[in-house]
């Protein structure tokens, strides 16, 4: 990347988006933010670009930046809504077959962060995820349903947890997102141990 001339990168803004995501995955956050500034400069230098294309570029930039806000649902949601408003097509930097949970077997363990705030976090997931699904072709489908079912399980509401689990299984059926299936399977296993379900 260091050997690629800046002017070449500026001529290929979609490549900048993919590189931003790669830098995030490699934990090269300063380089990721440097690429973001390059993308913004490139968009500003090209007023002739169609507004739809600019919206897609800037919206996807917001989507990628949202990962820096993990696991703050409110902060991530602001960027997802911004991306959703600007984008007219699905993101190119995120494949819906890729992992959504970064290997975690639990959505709740990923996003519940403050004691006493679980209801608010669940509501934020319900509000946030449709925007995220819209711009990622359903990547992580069922996350909010799984999180709510896990919350019901932890509250001892085993029947509600089982119903939520079945809803989640139905939501993710056939979408190829194994990581979401594993979250469901993990909850099903816990229910079989603690709730009398098999």
Per-segment meaning from a language model:
Residues 187-190, 198:
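Long, low-complexity regulatory tails in eukaryotic proteins
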